[in-house]
Amino acid sequence: MASPLRLRSALALVTGAGSGIGRAVSVRLAKEGATVAACDLDRAAACETVWLLGGQGSEKVAPGGAHTAFQADVSEAGAVRRLLEQVQACFSRPPSVVVSCAGLTRDEFLLRMSEDDWDRVIAVNLKGIFLVTQAAAQALVSSGCRGSIINISSIVGKVGNVGQTNYAASKAGVIGLTQTAARELGRHGIRCNSVLPGFITTPMTQKVPQKVLDKVIGMIPMGHLGDPEDVADAVTFLASEDSGYITGASVEVTGGLYM
């Protein structure tokens, strides 16, 4: 049986924490006892998440041990480096749980997709996860700390999706990146896993036409879209020692879609 407060001593860094899956992950990790460093490109959104957790909402005033909001563009190496420095300065330790949820879509058919739309999605969804994974791992290794890194991919990274060449490529890359990181970092006591959501009710999927959603729902054996909390459940398991011998895994949270 899973024990309560499985993450009582953990410091968790969550990117994309201002909405959707990232916010749900932040809430769930906090309920399990973790202190959450909630990061988002939108500082106000990150602060709102921290307010929901009962924290301070700004890295400038939060004492060590309080849930705290941070702002960073994960596609920029300097910003990610500063983020890890700020988190460590605030809490006097590196995050032992790192969850990369930051992502975006710029959908278009392959024949019409612009180079800018391709580049931006790859920069945030794939390069951003590389930068966060690298910086977090460097901080953990230099401190001699164990950790769990969880990267949010997508089932689309395995099967593709019409109109999402850039998104599918970025999410497929996340799977390969995470598996390789798991091979390299295991000897340091750092586990790396990816979570592959299916169609989840988030601000991102709210842009999808209803007729498309109806078609997708008809393909899901469980008969409905997932909730962000469903993804948060999987992330929490991978963050905890309940999954202590799991690394390099890709956990699908899809309701059975594309089995």
UniProtKB/Swiss-Prot annotation:
<dbReference type="GO" id="GO:0051290">
    <property type="term" value="P:protein heterotetramerization"/>
</dbReference>
<comment type="subunit">
    <text>Heterotetramer with CBR4; contains two molecules of HSD17B8 and CBR4.</text>
</comment>
<keyword id="KW-0560">Oxidoreductase</keyword>
<comment type="function">
    <text>Required for the solubility and assembly of the heterotetramer 3-ketoacyl-[acyl carrier protein] (ACP) reductase functional complex (KAR or KAR1) that forms part of the mitochondrial fatty acid synthase (mtFAS). Alpha-subunit of the KAR complex that acts as scaffold protein required for the stability of carbonyl reductase type-4 (CBR4, beta-subunit of the KAR complex) and for its 3-ketoacyl-ACP reductase activity, thereby participating in mitochondrial fatty acid biosynthesis.</text>
</comment>
<protein>
    <recommendedName>
        <fullName>(3R)-3-hydroxyacyl-CoA dehydrogenase</fullName>
        <ecNumber>1.1.1.n12</ecNumber>
        <ecNumber>1.1.1.62</ecNumber>
        <ecNumber>1.1.1.239</ecNumber>
    </recommendedName>
</protein>
<feature type="modified residue" description="N6-succinyllysine">
    <location>
        <position position="171"/>
    </location>
</feature>
<dbReference type="GO" id="GO:0006703">
    <property type="term" value="P:estrogen biosynthetic process"/>
</dbReference>
<feature type="binding site">
    <location>
        <begin position="13"/>
        <end position="21"/>
    </location>
    <ligand>
        <name>NAD(+)</name>
    </ligand>
</feature>
<dbReference type="GO" id="GO:0047035">
    <property type="term" value="F:testosterone dehydrogenase (NAD+) activity"/>
</dbReference>
<dbReference type="GO" id="GO:0004303">
    <property type="term" value="F:estradiol 17-beta-dehydrogenase [NAD(P)+] activity"/>
</dbReference>
<comment type="pathway">
    <text>Lipid metabolism; fatty acid biosynthesis.</text>
</comment>
<feature type="binding site">
    <location>
        <begin position="200"/>
        <end position="202"/>
    </location>
    <ligand>
        <name>NAD(+)</name>
    </ligand>
</feature>
<dbReference type="InterPro" id="IPR036291">
    <property type="entry name" value="NAD(P)-bd_dom_sf"/>
</dbReference>
<dbReference type="GO" id="GO:0005886">
    <property type="term" value="C:plasma membrane"/>
</dbReference>
<keyword id="KW-0444">Lipid biosynthesis</keyword>
<dbReference type="Pfam" id="PF13561">
    <property type="entry name" value="adh_short_C2"/>
</dbReference>
<dbReference type="GO" id="GO:0008209">
    <property type="term" value="P:androgen metabolic process"/>
</dbReference>
<dbReference type="GO" id="GO:0106386">
    <property type="term" value="F:(3R)-hydroxyacyl-CoA dehydrogenase (NAD+) activity"/>
</dbReference>
<feature type="modified residue" description="N6-succinyllysine">
    <location>
        <position position="158"/>
    </location>
</feature>
<dbReference type="GO" id="GO:0070404">
    <property type="term" value="F:NADH binding"/>
</dbReference>
<dbReference type="GO" id="GO:0005759">
    <property type="term" value="C:mitochondrial matrix"/>
</dbReference>
<feature type="binding site">
    <location>
        <begin position="72"/>
        <end position="74"/>
    </location>
    <ligand>
        <name>NAD(+)</name>
    </ligand>
</feature>
<feature type="binding site">
    <location>
        <position position="154"/>
    </location>
    <ligand>
        <name>substrate</name>
    </ligand>
</feature>
<dbReference type="GO" id="GO:0005740">
    <property type="term" value="C:mitochondrial envelope"/>
</dbReference>
<feature type="modified residue" description="Phosphoserine">
    <location>
        <position position="58"/>
    </location>
</feature>
<keyword id="KW-0443">Lipid metabolism</keyword>
<dbReference type="GO" id="GO:1990204">
    <property type="term" value="C:oxidoreductase complex"/>
</dbReference>
<keyword id="KW-0597">Phosphoprotein</keyword>
<comment type="similarity">
    <text>Belongs to the short-chain dehydrogenases/reductases (SDR) family.</text>
</comment>
<comment type="pathway">
    <text>Steroid biosynthesis; estrogen biosynthesis.</text>
</comment>
<keyword id="KW-0520">NAD</keyword>
<dbReference type="GO" id="GO:0006633">
    <property type="term" value="P:fatty acid biosynthetic process"/>
</dbReference>
<keyword id="KW-0752">Steroid biosynthesis</keyword>
<feature type="active site" description="Proton acceptor">
    <location>
        <position position="167"/>
    </location>
</feature>
<dbReference type="InterPro" id="IPR002347">
    <property type="entry name" value="SDR_fam"/>
</dbReference>
<keyword id="KW-0496">Mitochondrion</keyword>
<dbReference type="InterPro" id="IPR020904">
    <property type="entry name" value="Sc_DH/Rdtase_CS"/>
</dbReference>
<dbReference type="GO" id="GO:0048038">
    <property type="term" value="F:quinone binding"/>
</dbReference>
<keyword id="KW-0275">Fatty acid biosynthesis</keyword>
<feature type="binding site">
    <location>
        <begin position="167"/>
        <end position="171"/>
    </location>
    <ligand>
        <name>NAD(+)</name>
    </ligand>
</feature>
<feature type="binding site">
    <location>
        <begin position="40"/>
        <end position="41"/>
    </location>
    <ligand>
        <name>NAD(+)</name>
    </ligand>
</feature>
<keyword id="KW-0276">Fatty acid metabolism</keyword>
